[in-house]
Design a protein with these regions (language model features):
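Compositionally biased, low-complexity flexible segments
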Residues: 24-32
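A conserved mid-domain beta-alpha-beta active-site/ligand-binding segment of alpha/beta enzyme cores
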Residues: 233-264
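Catalytic alpha-helical scaffold of carbohydrate-active enzymes acting on polysaccharides/glycoconjugates
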Residues: 4-11, 16-19, 31-187, 191-230, ...
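Active-site clefts of carbohydrate-active enzymes
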Residues: 237-239, 280-283
């Protein structure tokens, strides 16, 4: 896989994105738009609509009901929970299952109401089965004008799948989401780990952007077997999942970190394109003790004059239009 990124500067020196020793032997830069007038304008910071300094992406993960469970034939229950209890036996963790369902029953109404109140159009990264089992939520997402991005058929790992199984997993997710929501998903987010085939399969199945990357603050092209896809990097450091994986992290600390991230990127965006991703979960941020931290972050974003709040598909399309690839 060959990647293309817009040029960037740090101080007066132009630096490479990666060290020469990290480049695979025999690799060459794929022909692209890094020398076009559009790319030069992008590098000067005029990439986003209305001269915005920052593209802000809100990502709401919908995984509830699609997680691991012996009920679904899995060998173990879901290992990710608020208490850090990971059972190794093939028995259902009914307590954790109910904790996940909280996201649908109580968390979702809070999150949806907050997004509506502040006029936020988000990207909902949804495991297809989760939406199948929560049709009212699926309808609310569509009615709110949000984007639905595929987050797997179920919220399970795909890194151990062979190519045929992974292709079927991707196809089933896309077909299910389109049936449930009426929207064909154009983006994909794996359950963290993916395979060397994933990006090629996504291209072949008609996806236009991929989120499984954490290497930059702007999108970039990846080229696989001569075909291109936009990579829209995600972020884990500001994700509300940190309040589950690090239970001592308070909502106030999470909020402070998120705001600091926003401020640095917003200031950098005055001279170069920048994007911020904030990922949240219905069952986590939707809790009464956490929802106001999310609200305060949204209020902070809304208080800044030059922010473009957009779905990830909009960001991918805008970046691709401003930084077109040239075929060899």
């Amino acid at each position: 896989m060959l990647t293309e990124r817009g040029s960037w500067k740090f101080g007066a020196d132009t630096l490479p994105w990666r060290l020469a020793k990290d480049k695979p032997a025999g690799a060459r830069r794929a022909p692209g738009g890094t020398d076009t007038p559009e790319a030069r304008r992008m590098a000067q910071g005029s990439m986003w609509p209305d001269n915005a300094q920052l593209a802000m992406s809100f990502v709401v993960n919908v995984e509830e009901g699609a997680e691991y469970s012996p009920r679904e034939g899995d060998r173990h229950p879901e290992p990710v929970d608020e208490l850090g209890i990971a059972l190794k036996r093939p028995v259902r963790n009914l307590g954790n299952e109910s904790s996940y369902l909280y996201g649908v029953h109580a968390g979702a109404p809070r999150v949806m109401a907050l997004l509506e109140r502040y006029g936020i159009r988000a990207t909902f990264t949804a495991a297809a089965v989760a939406l199948e089992r929560a049709p009212e939520l699926a309808r609310a997402i569509v009615a709110g004008g949000h984007e639905v991005c595929a987050h797997g058929y179920r919220w399970i790992h795909q890194f151990s799948m062979d190519e045929a199984a992974e292709r079927e997993f991707i196809r089933k997710a896309a077909a299910s989401i389109e049936t449930t929501t009426g929207q064909r998903p154009y983006g994909w987010l794996s359950r963290y780990l993916f395979t060397e085939h994933t990006r090629r399969l996504l291209i072949e199945e008609g996806f236009t952007y991929h989120m499984d990357d954490y290497s930059d603050d702007v999108p970039f092209w990846d080229v696989v077997d001569g075909r291109a896809i936009v990579v829209v990097p995600y972020a884990l450091d500001s994700n509300d999942m940190k309040m589950w994986t690090a239970p001592a992290l308070t909502p106030e600390q999470w909020l402070a970190y998120a705001i600091e991230t926003f401020q640095v990127l917003y200031e950098e965006g005055a001279t170069r394109p920048r994007m911020m991703s904030l990922g949240v979960h219905l069952r986590i941020i939707g809790r009464p003790g956490r929802i106001r931290a999310f609200q305060r972050f949204v209020q902070h974003v809304r208080s800044q004059p030059r922010v473009w709040i957009a779905t990830r598909r909009e960001i991918a399309e805008r970046w691709a239009a401003a930084n077109p690839r040239r075929l060899a």
